[in-house]
From Swiss-Prot:
Keywords, ordered alphabetically: Antiport, Cell inner membrane, Cell membrane, Ion transport, Membrane, Sodium, Sodium transport, Transmembrane, Transmembrane helix, Transport
Organism the protein comes from: Pseudomonas putida (strain GB-1)
NCBIfam families, per the entry: PRK09547.1
Top-rank lineage group of the source organism: Bacteria
One term under GO cellular component: plasma membrane
Membrane topology: Multi-pass membrane protein
Family (UniProt): Belongs to the NhaB Na(+)/H(+) (TC 2.A.34) antiporter family.
Compartment(s) of residence: Cell inner membrane
Disulfide pairings: none
The protein's role, per its UniProt record: Na(+)/H(+) antiporter that extrudes sodium in exchange for external protons.
Gene Ontology MF term list: sodium:proton antiporter activity
Catalysed reaction, written as an equation: 2 Na(+)(in) + 3 H(+)(out) = 2 Na(+)(out) + 3 H(+)(in)
Protein name: Na(+)/H(+) antiporter NhaB
Amino acid sequence: MSRSLTGALAHGFLGQSPLWYKAIICLFLVLNPLLLVTVGPVAAGWALVLEFIFTLGMALKCYPLMPGGLLLVEALLLQMTTPQALYEELQHNFPVILLLMFMVAGIHFMKELLLFLFSRILLGVRSKAILSLLFCVLSAFLSAFLDALTVTAVIISAAVGFYAVYHRVASGANPREDSALDSDQQVAQLHREDLDQFRAFLRSLLMHGAVGTALGGVCTLVGEPQNLLIGHEMGWHFADFFFKVAPVSLPVLGAGLLTCVLLEKLRLFGYGTLMPEPVRQVLAAYAAEDDAARTQAQRIALWVQGLAALILIICLGLHVAEVGLIGLMVIVLITAFTGITDEHRLGRAFQDAMPFTSLLVVFFAVVAVIHQQQLFSPLISWVLTLPTEQQPGMLYLANGLLSAISDNVFVATIYITEVKQAFLNGGMSREHFETLAVAINTGTNLPSVATPNGQAAFLFLLTSAIAPLIRLSYGRMVWMALPYTVVMGGLGWWAVTYWL
């Protein structure tokens, strides 16, 4: 009996994660108290930080909230930080939590409008280079004001919808009835080549769209959660943030869009595949049927969502309230005027954001440990001993390398709080502090496109339903992101070093 109970407990621990992963987490939990007793709190603190980064890097094996949360519960029990310190950290960063709770949910109710826009572009533009550029530009623009994950989710929804329609037609099924999309057994030989080409076409569009969220996300206060966190520390509003970051973000945006066009024209790194004409004909016929069947209520809902989006942009630009509260207003406006009054339909809007919001609390617990043990103080002190003109570039590189394998919010939180403490201690001028803040912000946003671990939108795409359907693997994502990584990361470093 005891053996079966033990087996059930072992099986339930971290669910479907591999056994080796479970063993490593258990090893961490045993090792930390031993390190604390034998070599002291600083070494144990560094071990905890590295262990937490490991859980972020292994996000595809297990969502980091569970293993990271276990590590942080242990840290609290070992008194490496205190519940009060964690509470104060959360209180200080409450605007970021509001953003994730309400803004992401608010954008959820705009999905129909966004899906409509992306669908129109996909079928209305025949040039692949122009189509890719439009996808990248629209993703960048939307991500500058909306949540990057939601924008990515909309692009994925459009891609899944179009893929499903053609896959069913190629399999001889009704395009409006459910079928097994993960199997090609029923696909006629005549359509297999077109289907493979369509997969490559969708892969390139999705990657352009995902990169677009990073290009636009770095530009504004609400583009990424870490932007709001840094802006909050600096006391910057929407316009302040945009102009402070513009010397880096706008040249990188231009270079990123140029890279998009060149990749399509030169057909490098898996880009440049065209949509087969038979596929276009099937999708156009399907879209025409949808347009004809659209009801008056659905048309009104699109207008309401568009008006709410306009109000959102105006409110953000004028900073009429905290970003999260503006998101709550968007929820109220759209739901009130489109008839969404059911509690369960409303609740679904919050499902996407709450896991990451919970994980953010764990981030801040790690930051509380870092503060209490002063883990990063020597590193920041060393950077500040460098000549003033070298400090922004060095911070950019330090942020970029860590952000490529870890979470941007976590990395940005660590560096901005440590640099701010140095500023408060009289270690630099306000002007130089602002320069370093821009270096930290761009360093966490731009080089992180290198891997799916670095960008939440990339990780979301990799773990979505569309990835296996279009044969988008981890390695293929890294390969397709490589030219963007070199251009965005390299130009970002140059701009931070020489143009700020």
